[in-house]
Amino acid sequence: MRILFAGIIARYPLGGVTWCSLMYLLGLRSLGHEVFYVEDTGECIYDPEQNTRSLDPAYGLAYIDHALRPYGLGDSWSFVNYDGTYHGRSREDVAAFARSADLFINLSGGTWFWRDEYASIPRRAFIDSDPAFTQLSIAKNEDWYVKFFRGFTHLFTFGANIGTPASPVPTGDFVWHKTWQPVVTSLWHTDAPPRRDRYTSVMSWTIESFTDVGGNKDIEFLRFIDLPARTGPRFELAVNGPERLLQENGWATVPAMQVSRTPGGYRDFIQSSRGEFGVAKHTYVATRSGWFSDRTECYLAAGRPAIVQDTGWTSHLPSDAGLLAFSSIDEAADAIERVDADYARHARAASDIADAHFEAGRVLSSLVERASMGGRHFADSASERGERAAEGQWTVQRTPATAASEESEGKPSGMR
């Protein structure tokens, strides 16, 4: 199968974002598919060297090439700048690939355009990595946004509960199918013991996108800010948030860009960690979306236990060893104690969970099979539309943030 894949590697040229697209490309190729990467967001790239948006795409172009070329994909990409100019492969090359493509996959808004070459591909799948936020934005009924999603033949989401009675998020006429971020586990496995005796995370304190429909991680994190007082200084965060506030409460911090500047640096930070302690965005939690982090999957694949906030994902994944859920500060402290009491067992279980649930071959075989079927992504019955959600008129409960910050996780302000 020939697959045109749209991602956001240059738009957000940072380690964690890069791995998301890269593992789709590598996973699909390992299944025997021919892949081509395109990026066509209509927006300026973020340039970490200048710490700002840039009209000059040079940094992003070099970054894409450095990310893809080591894996044999150096001649299989095209970047469309905000001004419509093509870099890497030409528009003619993209159109030629698309003419014989079987499937178009758009991850996280790798393009917001329906150019003829994209629209002509028989199967067109969108991968929603921001569940609840995406559906709540669609529910605002902005014409261009609704029409954009109607252009796909299949819609997938990292929110395992979206469109089910477990979550009140309105889905309207759209049908969303559950999927996970694929992980090429062989690229994350390590036999080396962790160099840090701390649980870590790479996190965004706040983001600017979707501020009118949801709440961010700062709201949730404040509920757990006293955790080090119970467990001791066990945590290290890569965050560009309120570092003084965090440090005063026992959280060690490192510059987010130091960790996220490259895919290699991001992976090294995860592999060197004892495990992950992860808090979710408020909207993921409040809507019981079932969202599960691509970053957490990488910790697990590295054999690093993960202690992460429950968003409803516990209905779909194991949560007793290697991967532990919490909803309260007491549960978080207990989870730390449990992992510390038998670290080797939890580390083995972490790897097993990654292999069983997130291995790229497994995830992508299922996705491609479903995307190749006739199917439909428009609901035609009240039960499918989840009228319970529409009638509930879901609104996000927000509290004032105590501090503003730039993004971390290597994502500049405006990251979805």
Q: For each predicted feature, which ranges?
A:
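Conserved catalytic-core segment of nucleotide-activated headgroup transferases in glycan assembly
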Residues: 163-275, 281-286
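P-loop/Walker A phosphate-binding loop and immediately adjacent motor/lid segment at beta-alpha junctions
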Residues: 116-129, 171-190, 302-304
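C-terminal alpha-helical cap of glycosyltransferases
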Residues: 360-401, 406-411, 415-416
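Residues that mark the start of a beta-strand
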Residues: 1-3, 123, 198-200
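Extended catalytic core of nucleotide-activated donor transferases of GT-like folds
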Residues: 4-31, 36-157, 161-166, 260-265, ...
